[in-house]
Amino acid sequence: MTGRLGIDDVRPRILDGNPAKAVVGEIVPVSAIVWREGHDAIAATLNVSGPEDSSVAAEPIQIHMRPTPDNQDQSNAFFVPDVPGNWTFRVDAWSDPMATWRHAITTKIEAGQGSDELYNDFEHGAQLFERAAENLSKEDRTALFDVASSLRRGGDVRARLAPALTASVTHLLELNPLRELVTMGENLQVRVERRAALVNSWYELFPRSTGGWDESGTPVHGTFATTAQALERVAKMGFDTVYFPPIHPIGEVNRKGRNNTLTPEPHDVGSPWAIGSKDGGHDATHPRLGTIEDFQALLARARELNLEVALDLALQAAPDHPWAQEHREFFTVLADGTIAYAENPPKKYQDIYPINFDNDAPKIYEEVYRVVKFWVDLGVTTFRVDNPHTKPANFWQWLISAIHKSNPEVIFLAEAFTRPARLYGLAKIGFSQSYTYFTWKVTKEELTEFATEIARMADISRPNLFVNTPDILHASLQHGGRAMFAIRAALAATMSPVWGVYSGYELFEHEAVKPGSEEYLDSEKYELRPRDFEGALERGDSLEDYIALLNQIRRANPALQQLRNIHFHEADNDQIIAYSKVDALTGNTVLIVVNLDPRSAREATVRLDLGALGLEAGAQFEVRDAITGSRYLWSETNFVRLEPLRDVAHIFVLPELPASRRERLAWREIKTYRA
């Protein structure tokens, strides 16, 4: 917007009016283009106010914005919200007469002008300092009056000017600027969520697969009680959230058999996503898992282990779901009177009825809200939403807003493998996190482009980097050997503050149902899959310890707990990728170097952008590998060799940056001006 002074391209700003995203304790960088006519100096102030229970609720704080050294028109600042809720910020531009005067008189003195020629300049400066002294404390007022007196004294011009240029006076004026032609910007919103919306590690497991085997070696159906026992291992690996696929009754009509066959055996358990039977629907638990009370006991055990339970919200129904019997209007009824089942040609899902949200929207909205609120009231605060991009956007916007009115702590993860317009559209209307195409990004070029993009979109979307899912076993894992599992885990755990693992990954499960498919052989979606995690660990056939170490490193390094700041460094081998993250609040800096080749040792010369690390040109510094504990002396140019059978990655922790070198690292890196 342009008033007396120009204020353009304020960021973060979501163009359709939705709030930007942030979490408690996160740096929120704010930038703006401020400009004016002529040569007079211009400055900007960031005004921030928070919700009622924040530290800045009663009176907004004002933060002086600083220009980017190589782009004087861009002003920068940041704030750190301390409570969840809706925060408001505004950028004001103002003419800075003091800076204009300082620049002018300094230039004239350097040009050799004397006392007589500078009479008006000194008098103007004295008057500015007298104006600036108004409303200050007695001590500060006296300091500025002394400067004015010095400017009016005769004698050497440099000596007269010197008191006006001291660090203490400069700092005092920065805290209490003399502002003219103040132009107020637009109030913009930031939706601040609890920290788990950004910093989180997820582990997915099927509760029904936690029952082990009977004496004959036959899998036993798990319960909420056996799941509670399984949580101890999950917590030991350092995960924050354990996610369960649907725990509801499973339809018996058109039930799928093993490996998605249409001819199930009597003992086949079906797909958990075919929700609903005579035993209940979305507000019931599968009878073989246990009762609602048993589920509450599981929640209590999870809390004891500092784990959060995420439930699957899949808005679809099996043919024998109560909705299909009592609310046929929720679905699409065909000409022959049957209800349409789900299709994604040529695939057919005869065991699932998709909901038609245009048939009876008010009742559907009311029923889904009732179901979600039922689980929230039991203590569930996170939902992984199945295929939200196949449901209307306005429904999700309404539902998330309605739940947040009473329970703002609830997190919604969008399982939306879809086009950017849909993925980012869902994020803008309220989803806290989103699945991504990380699984399919395998080359150095693809990974660099992907990580740069997710950092750039941090105001809108928070990516959850799952290394695998029950639906996705990427070819790189099928054929890359054990080293590839470690490589992908290291990348996911360090590229985003949110990452996830589906059970079995730590056992290097890699067999596909057929060549060219990404479906697991003997998929857990259709059968019980108990696993001998303890035996695998004893045999050395497990990635558990490595995953636990990654989560430990993430917790210990704030740089890995933020999304916005990632910088790639040059490595002269297309199989070696190097990138860094810096936390501007603590000065914590982490440099990650990964060998993308799971079969061969790779060497590279890594050339660091020292400025991106907050370091001076020519700096030498010690780095500590958080994986091995080894220490090295590094500089701008460094040799790296990584062997898959030993170490697939370095995660180097650099010396803590001093406060004086941190601030600029929090600023937005804007390469193009957005009009």
From Swiss-Prot:
Signal peptide: none annotated. InterPro entries: GlgE (IPR026585), GLGE_C (IPR049171), GlgE_dom_N/S (IPR021828), Glyco_hydro_13_cat_dom (IPR006047), Glyco_hydro_b (IPR013780), Glycoside_hydrolase_SF (IPR017853), Ig-like_fold (IPR013783). Gene3D superfamilies: Glycosidases, Golgi alpha-mannosidase II, Immunoglobulins, Phosphotransferase system, lactose/cellobiose-type IIA subunit. Its EC number is 2.4.99.16. It is an enzyme of class 2 (transferase). The keyword Glycosyltransferase applies. The record marks D471 as: Transition state stabilizer. One of its GO terms (biological process) is alpha-glucan biosynthetic process. GO terms for molecular function: hexosyltransferase activity; hydrolase activity, hydrolyzing O-glycosyl compounds. Keywords: Carbohydrate metabolism, Glycosyltransferase, Transferase. The active site is at D386, E415. The keyword Glycosyltransferase applies. It catalyses: alpha-maltose 1-phosphate + [(1->4)-alpha-D-glucosyl](n) = [(1->4)-alpha-D-glucosyl](n+2) + phosphate. Pfam families: GLGE_C, GlgE_dom_N_S. Alpha-maltose 1-phosphate binds at K256, Q316, D351, N387, K525, Y526. It comes from the Bacteria. Belongs to the glycosyl hydrolase 13 family. GlgE subfamily. Maltosyltransferase that uses maltose 1-phosphate (M1P) as the sugar donor to elongate linear or branched alpha-(1->4)-glucans. Is involved in a branched alpha-glucan biosynthetic pathway from trehalose, together with TreS, Mak and GlgB. Homodimer. This is Alpha-1,4-glucan:maltose-1-phosphate maltosyltransferase. It comes from Corynebacterium glutamicum (strain ATCC 13032 / DSM 20300 / JCM 1318 / BCRC 11384 / CCUG 27702 / LMG 3730 / NBRC 12168 / NCIMB 10025 / NRRL B-2784 / 534). The gene is glgE.
